[in-house]
Swiss-Prot record:
Its main location: membrane. InterPro entries: FN3_dom, FN3_sf, Growth/epo_recpt_lig-bind, Ig-like_fold, Long_hematopoietin_rcpt_CS, Type-I_Cytokine_Rcpt. This is Prolactin receptor. The keyword Repeat applies. Glycans are attached at residues 59, 91, 100, 112, 132, 262, 303, 315, 335.
Length: 831
């Protein structure tokens, strides 16, 4: 909390200074102490380099303290040593004492101090350069030598006991290496072994012990004469035309050989043999020749030489070839002006204007010039160069307010030639953009902003958690009733689905599914139709138990023992080729299905014993598989039976081939059987008595008398096999179930009736069948032959069709002329 408050206060204090900096005004830059120097160990001076002034007038003050004192003193003299300096006279100079010196720059906004400089007068002694250096050649015993003389520095007191040590250096004028000679405390020196006829350069310097060497004195030149000799060869330095109309050439003389020497410039033009002399030796100065318009020719090459002549002889320079077109170098531009423009609602900018050189004829187009300018801040060292082109005016927008700039311009011809010299330096001060009112506005805005920041930071410290919760509310959890968020976080999807009431898929059946295309109903002599005493409605006393059918709709009929046993017999009649196609797969399932069939036979026998006491009806025993649903009357509702039939038409039936009839009858598996109840048969008899029609019920045969086509022990159960639609009229096929080891078909005797037509569908899922008097009775001896023939023919047709589709005409042959199909002729058996 305390640190936040301190940082906020600092922001408030520094914000006005930052605002002023944005306005172009700031506290001054830090100055830098360049050097401190003592000329004679009695006085010394210090110089500094100012920093930026921050756009405001700045004062510089030098403060110093001595190592043995705590008091701070100010510079005693700011004038003697020049600007930006401080002079310490004898009264303020203490030898063997260390001075701690700093320079402080101050303006209206603030101040800034330099780094401290520690000074000991003994170690900063550097005397001035010797003065009055003179050179003279003398001859002694026909030997020529050089005599040099000088004086001590001007500030040296003659009455002082300081001794200066001197040093002299000399070199030939044309060479770069110096020869240094230590002189000692004397102020004169004799130099021998000099080459006659050579020009020499001489300098001298001094020092105090201890201390540093002074600067070298100014150069002095002298020619060592060599008696009587011709002059040396002169050198042509350059030729230049300022306006492409006239030109001038300059040369450098050689040694004169000890005699007065005259210099003559001679030239000739290309294509001419005549030699001309320089027309003007005065206009361009000494050692030069000026060619006016009369003597200047364009697109002509000049061959120029300079000849030096004295009493002993002459010497000529190397030839110099000149084409006026390529030696054009104009004079610098003139009348350079700088003007600061201050438009309304815009930033100020600088306008530079200049004029071409006076000698250049740019109006007539004889000479076209291109311009280039350079500028830099007064304190800067690097120049910024801008190419302007042929215009004589330029606007500059990106100048820093409060700075002082130096600007120069030069020019050159547009095609051939070289750049002129830079014009003289021009200075301009860029004022600050912001006025006092603007500064006040920015200061007020800065203070208000700092207060707002302080309030926000204080609020964040006090109510940080509440504000974070308000700005970033937590993500709400799921609000679905019954969902456990812990289950979602742990990723237990199964437990989550069970909590929502979503159950998994039902388990698959252990046996192969068999889907039947048609239903067949067979009736015998002892099967009696139960009369109904109700108008399409079941008895109110009847207790109906519903059974949720399988999603496959028809498995109860498909997997019935009577159907499967007959399928086994029909499949055995197929050719041997068909019987061996899937034998390998079927044999692998034999062991498992035999054990399952044994359980079914035991349950069936138990059901036969329980149903033997009833004389009116029989029901189906149900083989309860795991996860099976409670039983219900599946065939009391023709609507439900019809739905089951429609669902089975879209399912593929797997065909299984077997080896022989005995194995197929024993290994056919059952999936589901639909049980009936004894109480329903009584209610169906009442329904039959009212409507005078028959229903699909079968009466149990109590006696051991064998029917012409079935065993008495196998007549306990009747099931609806399939509901089909033929010619837009519903029909029902019923199938009896056999448990005998062998399936045989017999026709019904003349005394029995066969119900083959559906009269109507009553309410409450009642199916009404009508007897058909047109059905002929086929002798029992002919049925096996037809069945075998039909099985062979059907096997060839359904070899590659998986036993899913069968022609209705073939079914009529199996049922003795009725209009219902017997699926036992085309459905495969199961292993």
């Amino acid at each position: 909390m305390k640190q936040d408050l301190i940082s906020s206060v600092q922001i408030i204090l520094f914000l006005p200074l930052t605002t002023v900096g944005l306005a172009g005004q700031s506290f001054p830059g830090k100055p830098k102490i360049i050097r401190c120097r003592s000329l004679e160990k009695e006085t010394f001076s210090c110089w500094w380099k100012p920093g930026s002034d921050g756009g405001l007038p700045t004062n510089y003050t030098l403060f110093y303290s001595k190592d043995s004192e705590e008091e701070i003193y100010e510079c005693p003299d700011y004038r003697t040593s020049g600007p930006n300096s401080c002079y310490f006279n004898k009264n303020h100079t203490s030898p063997w004492t260390t001075f701690n010196i700093t320079v402080t720059a101050t303006n209206e906004i603030g101040s800034n101090s330099s780094d401290p400089q520690y000074v000991d007068v003994t170690s900063i002694v550097q005397p001035g350069s010797p003065v009055n250096l003179t050179l003279e050649t003398k001859r002694s015993a026909n030997i020529m030598y050089l005599w040099a003389k000088w004086s001590p520095p001007l500030l040296a007191d003659a009455s002082s006991n300081h001794l200066y040590h001197y040093e002299l250096r000399i070199k030939p004028e044309e060479k770069e290496e110096w020869e240094t000679i230590s002189v000692g405390v004397q102020t004169q020196c004799k130099i021998n072994r000099l080459n006659a006829g050579m020009r020499y350069v001489v300098q001298v310097r001094c020092t105090l012990d201890p201390g540093e060497w002074s600067e070298w004195s100014s150069e002095r030149h002298i020619l060592i004469p060599s008696g009587q000799s011709p002059p040396e060869k002169p050198t042509i330095i350059k030729c230049r035309s300022p306006e492409k109309e006239t030109f001038t050439c300059w040369w450098k003389p050689g040694l004169d050989g000890g005699h007065p020497t005259n210099y003559t410039l001679l030239y000739s033009k290309e294509g001419e043999e005549q030699v001309y002399e320089c027309p003007d030796y005065r206009t361009a100065g000494p050692n030069s020749c000026y060619f006016d318009k009369k003597h200047t020719s364009f697109w002509t090459i000049y061959n120029i030489t300079v000849r030096a002549t004295n009493e002993m002889g002459s010497n000529s320079s190397d030839p110099h070839y000149v084409d006026v077109t390529y030696i054009v170098q104009p004079d610098p531009p003139v009348n350079v002006t700088l003007e600061l423009k201050k438009p309304i609602n815009r930033k100020p900018y600088l306008v530079l204007t200049w004029s071409p050189p006076p000698l250049a004829d740019v109006r007539s187009g004889w000479l076209t010039l291109e311009y280039e300018l350079r500028l830099k801040p007064e304190e800067g060292e690097e120049w910024e160069t801008i190419f302007v082109g042929q215009q004589t005016q330029y606007k500059m927008f990106s100048l820093n307010p409060g700075k002082k700039y130096i600007i120069q311009i030069h020019c050159k011809p547009d095609h051939h030639g070289s750049w002129s010299e830079w014009s003289s330096e021009n200075y301009i001060q860029i004022p600050n953009d912001f006025r006092v009112k603007d500064m006040i506005v920015w200061i007020v805005l800065g203070v208000l902003s700092s207060l707002i920041c302080l309030i926000m930071s204080w609020t964040m410290v006090l109510k940080g958690y509440r504000m974070i919760t308000f700005m970033l509310p937590p993500v709400p959890g799921p609000k679905i009733k019954g969902i456990d968020t812990h289950l979602l976080e742990t990723g237990k999807s199964e437990e989550l689905l069970s909590a929502l009431g979503c159950h998994g898929l039902p388990p698959t059946s252990d046996c192969e599914e068999l889907l039947i295309e048609y239903l067949e109903v067979e009736d015998s002599e002892d099967q009696q139709l139960m009369p109904s005493h109700d108008n399409g409605h079941p008895s109110k006393n009847a207790k109906i138990t519903r059974k949720e059918t399988d999603s496959d709709s028809g498995r109860g009929s498909c997997d019935s023992p009577s159907l499967l046993s007959e399928k086994c017999r029909e499949t055995c009649a197929l050719p041997p080729v068909l019987q061996t196609q899937e034998v390998r797969d079927v044999q692998e399932k034999k062991a498992a299905k035999r054990s399952w069939e044994t359980q079914y036979v035991a349950s069936e026998r138990k059901a036969l014993l329980s149903n033997s006491e009833s004389a009116k009806s029989s029901t189906w025993p149900a083989v309860q598989l795991p996860n099976s649903q409670p039983p219900m009357f599946a065939y009391h509702s023709i609507v439900d039976a019809h739905k089951i039939t429609l669902n089975t038409t879209n399912t593929n039936v797997a065909a299984v081939l077997v080896e022989d009839e005995e194995e197929h009858q024993s290994q056919c598996s059952l999936t589901e059987t639909i049980p009936g109840e004894m109480e329903k048969q009584g209610e169906m008899e009442n329904l039959h008595s009212k409507t005078e029609q028959t229903t699909a019920q079968v009466k149990q045969n109590r006696s051991n008398e064998r029917l012409p086509f079935l065993d008495a022990a196998l007549m306990d159960y009747v099931e609806v096999h399939k509901v089909i639609r033929q010619d837009e009229e519903p029909a029902v096929l019923l199938k009896h179930k056999e448990n005998s080891g062998k399936i045989e078909k017999y026709t019904i005797s003349g005394a029995s009736k066969e119900y083959t037509k559906v009269s109507t569908v009553m309410d409450h899922n009642i199916l009404v069948l009508m007897p058909d008097s047109r059905v002929p009775h086929t002798p029992a001896s002919q049925e096996p032959a037809k069945e075998t023939s039909q099985s062979l023919q059907q096997g060839q047709v359904e070899k590659n069709m998986s036993y899913c589709l069968t022609a209705p005409s073939d079914c009529k042959r199996e049922t003795g002329g009725s209009e219902y199909m017997d699926p036992s002729s085309f459905m495969p058996s199961f292993k």
